[in-house]
Amino acid sequence: AAAMLAAPSQASQATGTKRPCEEMSTSAGSDAAEVELGPKPEKAYKSSDFLNSKGARMIRMMCELQQPGTVLEEHGVDNVIMFFGSARAKPRAQYEQAVRDAEAKAAADPSDTRAQGALARLQKQAFLIPMFDVVQELAKMTTEWSMRRAAQGKVAYSVGTGGGPGMMEAANKGAMLAGGKSIGFGISLPFEDHLNPYVTPDLAFEFHYFFTRKFWMSYKCMGLVVAPGGLGTCDELFEVITLMQTGKIRRSLPVILIGKQFWKSAINWDFFVQTGMISDEDANQLIFADTAQEAFDALVAGVTALECTPVASKKKA
């Protein structure tokens, strides 16, 4: 039997012919030598097409949740005083120039209702001018105070904003005038294509998702200053005080509202209490201020009190 099994192999060797399996092996090797290798596939995490696709949305969200924390940690930022307020506010000289331009445009074509409306809106915003100055001065005072504390080895605080123009720019500029750094948590919007120039470049962020931006504006927040603003400002304000009310933020942050008349008129806090929608405690946590000094005193008292509480000393979850 062994001889019979061996015979075909011996026969093929004798005749010089190849078995089918040998022919396939030789053919495959020849083809591989002739075919050029294609480009090396791109790794998924390096693929711009994939990372910007619908399928990678969760990955983009995770990036916006993780990257800011890494950057802030690298720069030693752990306690932030957040400033919210209208992007429409302007310093006096800029406001007056904007009014002159709007007046000229409206006068050139009295039938242009859009131009007339733009002028009317600008004129209504004149009350923001002194508050712009208050916010800028308050941010400057806060930064100077924090820098003195840092030099003494005490807890330091950084000014943070939404990174845009208006009241946000006022706060970032105030911090810069004091010689300090400040944060800008920007958001990509069709009518704002860059952050204001006073944000510290290393602490400038641009978010795509509002919820990740709002997370970082509240996560390291140890005090809140809110200047007059519209829907966006109110959204940010209510986000923070709701997190406090529900215990998601486990510390009683000082909440300073700049412009008592504006905030008392815009939101009827007393009516909320009278109808049982919020408690006296909820309303009483709001501090109204009209001057930078008044706001500064309340802010310092609030944040230093937090330093003495057990919750403030715990690592945030």
Task: Locate predicted features.
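Solvent-exposed alpha-helices and their adjacent loops that cap or buttress functional pockets
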Residues: 73-76, 149-154, 176, 196-199, ...
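Short, solvent-exposed amphipathic alpha-helical segments in soluble enzyme
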Residues: 98-100, 176-177, 239-244, 271-274, ...
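Glycine-rich beta-alpha loop segments
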Residues: 23-185
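Active-site/ligand-binding-proximal alpha/beta "capping" segment
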Residues: 208-257, 307
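Glycine-rich phosphate/pyrophosphate-binding loop at beta-loop-alpha junctions
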Residues: 176-179, 186-201, 245-249, 253-279
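C-terminal functional extensions of proteins
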Residues: 257-317
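Phosphate/pyrophosphate-binding betaalpha-module
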Residues: 158-227, 238, 263
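Universal eukaryotic N-terminal targeting presequences
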Residues: 1-27
